[in-house]
């Protein structure tokens, strides 16, 4: 199915990505292709705070026996992945728990259709926010880059944020994002204006669509919604490029729904062998 493809084509299932996020696993963990073994438990590679989707794991009884595995604890799985895991006859007990929610936006062929698909209230709100932005900003341009200069802007906007968001960009996290940007198909979309770069979106773009992994904004401009304005421009650009989806990934921030996103339930799986 399309959803299945969207999850399995996401960056989070790719070898070079898993190679990068394994640093978040325990030092003692034994890392395999798409899972790790921690003690006697099969777990995911990479912390769920950083990894939005998971590869579908194919585990055979040999793995269990050779590594004296007695449990499987996996997170952030899609429904189709749970179904596949449950076809295994070896399990003693299974617990499936609703966990994170991701938000996804399917894109039509025309931007006009996208606007029509929004609820009347959301369409009205979007227009109001765009007018407010244009009233304050004389010129703007949507650009994309893998350059250090824009990466530094992304990082410093994070560090200047208030509250939790300001604490997010530690030295390790910064190094992780810097390495991520070096991988194929990762880039930063940014909104360049006569008043500087007001917002950025750290994305992975595939042939079929775009995954919004993280974002930042210049807090001086919060009152004119630079994030919404940027996302709207990205949506227009993706539609022009013929992309099928804009995946907002994990987290239920309101703006994702305001822009027409639909929630996608993810699950955690606890298995005893």
How does the language model describe each region?
Residues 1-45, 85-102, 109-223:
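A conserved beta-strand-loop-helix scaffold within acyl/acetyltransferase catalytic domains
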Residues 107-109, 273:
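Non-catalytic surface loops within mature trypsin-like serine protease
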Residues 98-102, 263-273:
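Conserved catalytic-core motifs of GNAT/GCN5-like acyltransferases
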Residues 138, 186, 243, 264-265:
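Secondary-structure boundary/capping residues
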Residues 149, 254-255, 272-273:
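Short secondary-structure capping/turn micro-motifs that flank functional sites
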Residues 4-5, 37-97, 207-263:
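Acyl-donor binding region in acyl/amide transferases
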Residues 53, 124, 172-175, 179, ...:
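Short, surface-exposed, charged/polar-biased interaction segments
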